[in-house]
């Protein structure tokens, strides 16, 4: 009888795979505007020490000057997405201008890198932008938690703003362009790990939540 019960249980596990406890909490850290050289390198080191993967939305004009850092992001196992080439408002661009922004940035990505997401600077949107992203096979990505680290330059305040509001499935917006942002990011990781959160890339978060990102569609969080 015990052998029969064990066999039934094993078959049940094969037929109904476990995706993880419903009590598990997942979030995605995202970093805009880079790469930035020493700040990005310090961030990569800190994330590696904590076993955390993130998603970096890179600008083409920055990649042009920091190709080695872009390669380091990719080789460390982080996800790379696009943030346009010029960091100009893509919501005000023509279809052809958006296409060029995407193509010029794609040409600078590390070999083998196949991005899933495009984050328009400022979270901009337009029909031309959506169509260009769709035709390039890119989903659009915004965010659900924004502590405005780029403006306040106060690591403790940024940390508090995120920790006090973050929920399972959130996409956190940060930057890797200054010391205070890196300090805040690593402090946030430490605090949320202590609260039982698990950090994953945006693509991983979507998969965990059963979402298949569609080209041209905008996503802010995954519940």
Where do the protein language model's features map onto the residues?
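Hydrophobic h-region of N-terminal signal peptides that target proteins for export
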Residues: 5-18
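Active-site beta->alpha N-cap acidic-glycine motif
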Residues: 18-108, 114-115, 187, 207
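C-terminal domain-boundary segment and adjacent tail
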Residues: 21, 49-51, 64, 180-223
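A cross-domain feature marking catalytic cores of carbohydrate-active enzymes
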Residues: 31, 58-61, 82-84, 120-122, ...
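Conserved, mostly hydrophobic/aromatic
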Residues: 32, 47, 80-83, 118, ...
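Alpha-helical scaffold elements lining the catalytic groove of polysaccharide deacetylases
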Residues: 42, 88-113, 122-168, 181-184
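Residue-level detector of anion-binding/catalytic polar loops
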Residues: 53, 79, 139, 146, ...
């Amino acid at each position: 009888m015990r052998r029969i019960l064990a066999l039934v249980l094993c078959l049940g596990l094969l037929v109904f795979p476990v995706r993880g406890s419903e009590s598990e909490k997942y979030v995605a850290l995202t970093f805009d505007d880079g790469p930035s050289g020493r700040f990005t390198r310090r961030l990569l080191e800190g994330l590696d020490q904590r076993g955390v993967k993130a998603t970096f939305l890179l600008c083409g004009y920055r990649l042009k000057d920091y190709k080695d850092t872009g390669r380091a992001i990719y080789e460390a196992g982080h996800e790379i997405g696009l943030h346009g080439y010029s960091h100009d408002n893509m919501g005000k661009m023509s279809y052809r201008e958006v296409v060029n922004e995407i193509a010029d940035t794609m040409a600078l990505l590390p070999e083998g890198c196949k991005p899933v997401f495009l984050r328009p600077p400022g979270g901009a949107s337009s029909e031309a932008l959506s169509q260009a992203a769709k035709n390039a096979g890119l989903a659009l990505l915004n965010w659900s938690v924004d502590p405005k680290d780029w403006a306040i330059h106060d690591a403790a305040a940024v940390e508090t703003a995120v920790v006090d509001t973050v929920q399972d499935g959130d996409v956190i917006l940060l930057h890797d362009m200054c010391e205070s942002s890196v300090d805040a990011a690593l402090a946030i990781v430490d605090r949320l790990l202590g609260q039982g959160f698990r950090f994953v890339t945006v693509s991983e978060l979507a998969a965990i939540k059963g979402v298949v990102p569609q080209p041209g569609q905008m996503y802010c969080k995954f519940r």
